[in-house]
């Protein structure tokens, strides 16, 4: 979908968001609609089934859409950073020019060299003559000597000139601008990207390849093979040994008709890969974005993040935080209980000072 077409729905979606009040409930509305009105959550278990998705395909589809806009957001961040660096660079250049101009105005004008006539008596072929000695000769010789003396300094000065960045980091910057090679690379027969837990490999296919039965994909824990079926057999598009192990049970592939075979590989360990295949030119993992995507956070970590976010907003508004609300709820239950000395009195949360460490979540 084009960006302009997607923006046509902004007003309707904005109305929903304003009505529910937060992103979490907004997403519940969207996925609830998919659950009630579509076959999005229906599993395609048999070849004869005409509705639904294969196991894991719907989740992979959602993750792919998230990654697309996550890449766009990272590109926006990178663009803003580059614009800021460009402004700083221009400002520094202008300041340097101003300082140079001021220094040039204060620099003293050199005194012109004058001819000096020296009388000397020299025996040359038995004759005496007065020679007119002019400094230009010696001056040139001294100048030549000074050039030789200044040569080491010139070399040292040249060493201070910033060199161009190495080719590899510059290439990685280009990879980062492409969602298909974000945190990965573009190779001759395929393109790959990665996040904290998964890798995505795109293997281009000809336009006439539009059905899954026209390709063959074989995945093992340590290897990958992608081939295209032809009349005379198979044409291998990508094949090799993986640089790290993958989880084949949660890895899957699909065909984008006439475009590419899309292979999603699930990492066994949570670490960054510098290459997909052994023998492939490695990328510099120090030049990639190592921030962990929210999509890779499990439910327990997500709950903690949600609680911290809630507490932050409550604190800004001067309202009770989650640990205080939990204790208040417990106190309210016993406030008016039979035999309570506080029964009949108004419950005032301000009477209690509760530290965060006093509550277990």
UniProtKB/Swiss-Prot annotation:
Record GO biological process: cilium assembly; protein folding; protein localization to pericentriolar material
Feature: compositional bias, Basic and acidic residues: 87-97
Protein name per its UniProtKB record: NudC domain-containing protein 3
Keywords annotated in UniProt: Phosphoprotein
Region of interest (Disordered), residue spans: 87-106, 124-158
Compositionally biased spans, kind Low complexity: 148-158
InterPro entries named among the record's database cross-references: CS_dom (IPR007052), HSP20-like_chaperone (IPR008978), NudC_fam (IPR037898), NudC_N_dom (IPR025934), p23_NUDCD3 (IPR037905)
Keyword Phosphoprotein among record annotations: yes
Organism listed in the record: Homo sapiens
Record PTM Phosphoserine, positions in chain: 146, 340, 355
Signal sequence extent: none
Pfam families recorded: CS, Nudc_N
MF annotations from Gene Ontology: unfolded protein binding
Domain CS: 185-277
GO cellular component, one term: cytoplasm
Domain of life: Eukaryota
Listed transmembrane segments: none
């Amino acid at each position: 979908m084009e960006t302009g077409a997607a923006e046509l729905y902004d007003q309707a979606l904005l109305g929903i968001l304003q009505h529910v009040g937060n992103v979490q409930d907004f997403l519940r509305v969207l996925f609830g609609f998919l659950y009630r009105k579509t076959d999005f959550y229906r599993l395609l278990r048999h070849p004869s089934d005409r509705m639904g998705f294969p196991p894991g395909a719907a989740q992979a589809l959602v993750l792919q859409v998230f990654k697309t806009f996550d890449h766009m957001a990272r590109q926006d961040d990178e663009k803003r950073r580059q614009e800021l660096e460009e402004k700083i660079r221009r400002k520094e250049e202008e300041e340097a020019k101003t300082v140079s101009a001021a220094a040039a105005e204060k620099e003293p004008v050199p005194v012109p060299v004058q001819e000096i006539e020296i009388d000397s008596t020299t025996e040359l072929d038995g004759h005496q003559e007065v020679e007119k000695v002019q400094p230009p000769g010696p001056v040139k010789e001294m100048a030549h000597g000074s050039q030789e003396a200044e040569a080491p300094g010139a070399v040292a000065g040249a060493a201070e000139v910033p060199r161009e960045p190495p080719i590899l980091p510059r290439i990685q910057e280009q990879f980062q601008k492409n969602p298909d090679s974000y945190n990965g690379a573009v190779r001759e027969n395929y393109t790959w990207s990665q996040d904290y837990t998964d890798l995505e490999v795109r293997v281009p296919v000809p336009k006439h390849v539009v059905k899954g039965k026209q390709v063959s994909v074989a995945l093992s824990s340590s290897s990958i093979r992608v081939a295209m079926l032809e009349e005379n057999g198979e044409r291998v598009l990508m094949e090799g040994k993986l640089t790290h192990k993958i989880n084949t049970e949660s890895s899957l592939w699909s065909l984008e008709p006439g475009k590419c075979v899309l292979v999603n590989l699930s990492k066994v360990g949570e670490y960054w890969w510098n290459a997909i295949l052994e023998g492939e030119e490695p990328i510099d993992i120090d030049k990639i974005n190592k921030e962990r995507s929210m999509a890779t956070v499990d439910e327990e970590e997500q709950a903690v993040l949600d609680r911290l976010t809630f507490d932050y907003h409550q604190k800004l508004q001067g309202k009770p935080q989650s640990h205080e609300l939990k204790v208040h709820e417990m106190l309210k239950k016993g406030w008016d209980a039979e035999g309570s000395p506080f029964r009949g009195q108004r419950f005032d949360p301000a009477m209690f000072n509760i530290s965060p460490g006093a509550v277990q979540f």
